[in-house]
């Protein structure tokens, strides 16, 4: 791998933080900040477009931080798909490993997220088809690389004025219990098996989330706005019914088996009665996504071939990803070792 030529950097203080960026990035202005860093929009003079520049907060604060930084960099570098956020540039002002403390990532600047769009307007069935088709097209690609998003929700789906969609923040989420507690959107879109640790989950946790998102686009309301884990599960089972004995017996968790078995029996509702007025094909697809048994839940590839997407589905234009080496996930390295790996990724 060849090394990038080092650009000229300039310094600027924004929101009480020093930003040190290459001269090609001008007119920095704050977009937002989260637990893992803050984001500025900037004009990329070289490419002639506005971009998002993310400065990771304390990327090497702990082994967990350093590994997360490495994971994010590797994932973004691997993703090359129209419906998935990819990496345009990565840089650090450091000239040596010793001085390497900051990591900046540059991605496409996306305008609204799906949350903004649902709040502002009632979507037509055609809009819903196109948006959900793009999410599934992205998931087919991500899942083919053995990557699970784990945290799909409307705020992680960026949409531009042409209704073109990109998935953000994927594969990073190894969410802790406290982030899932209470009346939080993070949990409303979560598959029950991941929320309650029922069993080893698979790629279809993301399909459950798509079902929740699709239902919300069709109705304008959150499908399962649970106030806590238990209430969330009750809301889910009012629609899906309680799990059959055959599914309960496959749950490795003794606690989960006992708890689910103790619940009063609830029958599955007729989805057509719940989603009144929706396209029958949309209802049929929802019924195949919102299935408690992960082995029976539809996959992204299967969903793309569903008749609901007849006007968009093109098997020759729904690509898969190159294999993605995740062997680093099982490695226990020291902070300095992760830092060195990130430095090499940053230089190339």
UniProtKB/Swiss-Prot annotation:
<dbReference type="GO" id="GO:0010831">
    <property type="term" value="P:positive regulation of myotube differentiation"/>
</dbReference>
<keyword id="KW-0547">Nucleotide-binding</keyword>
<dbReference type="GO" id="GO:0004674">
    <property type="term" value="F:protein serine/threonine kinase activity"/>
</dbReference>
<keyword id="KW-0808">Transferase</keyword>
<keyword id="KW-0723">Serine/threonine-protein kinase</keyword>
<keyword id="KW-0346">Stress response</keyword>
<dbReference type="GO" id="GO:0004707">
    <property type="term" value="F:MAP kinase activity"/>
</dbReference>
<dbReference type="InterPro" id="IPR003527">
    <property type="entry name" value="MAP_kinase_CS"/>
</dbReference>
<dbReference type="GO" id="GO:0045663">
    <property type="term" value="P:positive regulation of myoblast differentiation"/>
</dbReference>
<feature type="modified residue" description="Phosphotyrosine; by MAP2K3">
    <location>
        <position position="183"/>
    </location>
</feature>
<protein>
    <recommendedName>
        <fullName>Mitogen-activated protein kinase 14B</fullName>
        <ecNumber>2.7.11.24</ecNumber>
    </recommendedName>
</protein>
<dbReference type="InterPro" id="IPR000719">
    <property type="entry name" value="Prot_kinase_dom"/>
</dbReference>
<keyword id="KW-0805">Transcription regulation</keyword>
<feature type="active site" description="Proton acceptor">
    <location>
        <position position="169"/>
    </location>
</feature>
<keyword id="KW-0597">Phosphoprotein</keyword>
<dbReference type="GO" id="GO:1901741">
    <property type="term" value="P:positive regulation of myoblast fusion"/>
</dbReference>
<dbReference type="GO" id="GO:0034644">
    <property type="term" value="P:cellular response to UV"/>
</dbReference>
<feature type="binding site">
    <location>
        <position position="54"/>
    </location>
    <ligand>
        <name>ATP</name>
    </ligand>
</feature>
<feature type="short sequence motif" description="TXY">
    <location>
        <begin position="181"/>
        <end position="183"/>
    </location>
</feature>
<dbReference type="GO" id="GO:0005524">
    <property type="term" value="F:ATP binding"/>
</dbReference>
<feature type="modified residue" description="Phosphothreonine; by MAP2K3">
    <location>
        <position position="181"/>
    </location>
</feature>
<comment type="similarity">
    <text>Belongs to the protein kinase superfamily. CMGC Ser/Thr protein kinase family. MAP kinase subfamily.</text>
</comment>
<dbReference type="GO" id="GO:0005737">
    <property type="term" value="C:cytoplasm"/>
</dbReference>
<dbReference type="GO" id="GO:0006357">
    <property type="term" value="P:regulation of transcription by RNA polymerase II"/>
</dbReference>
<dbReference type="Pfam" id="PF00069">
    <property type="entry name" value="Pkinase"/>
</dbReference>
<keyword id="KW-0963">Cytoplasm</keyword>
<comment type="function">
    <text>Serine/threonine kinase which acts as an essential component of the MAP kinase signal transduction pathway. Mapk14b is one of the four p38 MAPKs which play an important role in the cascades of cellular responses evoked by extracellular stimuli such as pro-inflammatory cytokines or physical stress leading to direct activation of transcription factors. Accordingly, p38 MAPKs phosphorylate a broad range of proteins and it has been estimated that they may have approximately 200 to 300 substrates each.</text>
</comment>
<dbReference type="InterPro" id="IPR017441">
    <property type="entry name" value="Protein_kinase_ATP_BS"/>
</dbReference>
<keyword id="KW-0539">Nucleus</keyword>
<keyword id="KW-0804">Transcription</keyword>
<dbReference type="GO" id="GO:0106310">
    <property type="term" value="F:protein serine kinase activity"/>
</dbReference>
<keyword id="KW-0418">Kinase</keyword>
<dbReference type="GO" id="GO:0035556">
    <property type="term" value="P:intracellular signal transduction"/>
</dbReference>
<dbReference type="InterPro" id="IPR050117">
    <property type="entry name" value="MAP_kinase"/>
</dbReference>
<dbReference type="InterPro" id="IPR011009">
    <property type="entry name" value="Kinase-like_dom_sf"/>
</dbReference>
<dbReference type="GO" id="GO:0038066">
    <property type="term" value="P:p38MAPK cascade"/>
</dbReference>
<feature type="domain" description="Protein kinase">
    <location>
        <begin position="25"/>
        <end position="309"/>
    </location>
</feature>
<dbReference type="InterPro" id="IPR008352">
    <property type="entry name" value="MAPK_p38-like"/>
</dbReference>
<feature type="binding site">
    <location>
        <begin position="31"/>
        <end position="39"/>
    </location>
    <ligand>
        <name>ATP</name>
    </ligand>
</feature>
<keyword id="KW-0067">ATP-binding</keyword>
<dbReference type="GO" id="GO:0005634">
    <property type="term" value="C:nucleus"/>
</dbReference>
């Amino acid at each position: 791998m060849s090394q990038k030529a080092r650009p000229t950097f300039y310094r600027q203080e924004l929101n009480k933080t020093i930003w040190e960026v290459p001269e090609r990035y001008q007119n920095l202005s704050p977009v937002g900040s989260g637990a893992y860093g803050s984001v500025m929009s900037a004009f990329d003079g070289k490419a002639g477009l506005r971009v998002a520049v993310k400065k990771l907060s304390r990327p090497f604060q702990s082994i967990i931080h350093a590994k997360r930084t490495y994971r994010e960099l590797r994932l973004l570098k691997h993703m090359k798909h129209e419906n998935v956020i990819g990496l345009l540039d990565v840089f650090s002002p450091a000239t040596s490993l010793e001085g390497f403390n900051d990591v900046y990532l540059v991605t496409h600047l996306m305008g609204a997220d799906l949350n903004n769009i649902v709040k502002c307007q009632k979507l037509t069935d055609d809009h819903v088809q196109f948006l959900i088709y793009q999410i599934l097209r992205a998931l087919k690609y991500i899942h083919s690389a053995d990557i699970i998003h784990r945290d799909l929700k409307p705020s992680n789906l960026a949409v531009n004025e042409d209704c073109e969609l990109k998935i953000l923040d994927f594969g990073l989420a190894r969410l802790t219990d406290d982030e899932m507690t209470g009346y939080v959107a993070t949990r409303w879109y979560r598959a029950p098996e991941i929320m309650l640790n029922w069993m080893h989950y698979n790629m279809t946790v993301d399909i459950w989330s798509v079902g929740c998102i699709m239902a919300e686009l069709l109705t304008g309301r959150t499908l399962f706005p649970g106030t806590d884990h238990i209430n969330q599960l009750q809301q889910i089972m009012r629609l899906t019914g309680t799990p059959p004995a055959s599914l309960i017996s496959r749950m490795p968790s003794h606690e989960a088996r006992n708890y689910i078995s103790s619940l009063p029996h609830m029958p599955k509702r007729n989805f057509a009665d719940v989603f009144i007025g929706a396209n029958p094909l949309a209802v049929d697809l929802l019924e195949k996504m919102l299935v408690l048994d992960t082995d029976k839940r539809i996959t992204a590839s299967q969903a793309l071939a569903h008749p609901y997407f007849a006007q968009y589905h093109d098997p020759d234009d729904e690509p898969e990803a190159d294999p993605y080496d995740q062997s680093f996930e099982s490695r226990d390295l020291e902070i300095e070792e992760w830092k060195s790996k990130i430095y090499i990724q940053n230089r190339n």
